Regions:
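Charged, low-complexity intrinsically disordered terminal segments
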Residues: 1-122, 126-265
Length: 265
């Protein structure tokens, strides 16, 4: 891959299969770190395929940090807590609700001002060298793996100096007061051998997927071919990365001076 000094490289991921391939490729090729930040991480087929790749990375010695918003974790934080039993996997929940049972919805209504402050960032960074940013969460509907519903969205595979800024944004959220270690959030008890159980289940799910039509689509993916040929056609340009800092969530009133809406109207 040819690099350009001081410029960043961008490759747009408009195809849903390519978007999955890019994330899977980063997970299986990471050597030191994986930083993963999402609003939604579904425990469906695509989510489990990526979880298996991430768990394999941790087994290789890669330090994995996962930051996920709490809004869609009702009853599902136990699987994340199982993964966090791995010595190389740290998981934090963004703005977690106190109630983890059916009182959760009541808390959402009573404390809407706080509970409504969510994290929509979507970041996947490998080795502080390659990153994916964009609109897709983790789930079948984002990667063309559902029959009844699939979303159209856009991500960018990025390399170069901008990855440092993307990594800094992850660190800001990871270290913020809104991010709580999952061990302090989930009250459900897990033991070390459950990690072996979930590893076996994820391995079995991936092995069965290798005979599926979806796996054939992955093999035929345009990005898969480019990765194998080591010929990803990055567009190189000067770039700046803008993001909302987590401190914005502590403000009671929006800063209208930085909003474009009033000026347009």
């Amino acid at each position: 891959m040819k690099t350009q000094q001081k410029q960043s490289g961008f490759y747009l991921l408009s195809d849903n299969i390519d978007a999955f391939v890019a994330r899977f490729a980063l997970a299986i090729s990471a050597k030191k770190t994986l930083d993963i930040q999402y609003y939604i991480i579904h425990n469906d087929a695509s989510g489990q395929y990526l979880a298996y790749a991430i768990l394999q990375a941790a087994d290789r010695g890669v330090h994995v940090r996962i930051l996920v918003d709490d809004i869609n974790l009702s009853g599902r934080d136990i699987r994340l807590k199982m993964l966090s039993q791995h010595d190389n996997i740290d998981i934090r929940i963004f703005n977690p609700l106190s109630n983890r049972d059916w009182f959760r919805n009541l808390e959402m209504i009573v404390h809407l001002d706080r509970a409504g402050r969510r994290m929509h960032n979507k970041v996947f960074v490998a080795d502080n060298a390659v990153a994916i940013i964009g609109g897709r969460n983790i789930g079948d509907e984002y990667f063309d793996n559902r029959n009844e519903l699939n979303f159209v969205d856009l991500d960018a595979l990025t390399v170069g100096p901008i990855v440092d800024d993307i990594g800094s944004s992850f660190d800001d959220y990871w270290n913020s007061c809104w991010a709580t270690p999952i061990e302090q959030v989930s009250r459900r008890h897990v033991v070390k051998n459950q990690l072996s159980t979930i590893r076996a289940k994820l391995r079995d799910r991936w092995q069965r997927a290798r005979n599926s039509q979806y796996f054939k689509s992955i093999q035929r993916s345009d990005l898969t071919k480019k990765i194998i040929a080591r010929e990803i056609p990055f567009v190189w340009a000067n770039a700046r990365f803008f993001y909302d800092r987590p401190e914005k969530l502590t403000r009671n009133k929006p800063e209208r001076t930085v909003h474009l809406g009033p000026h347009i109207m």
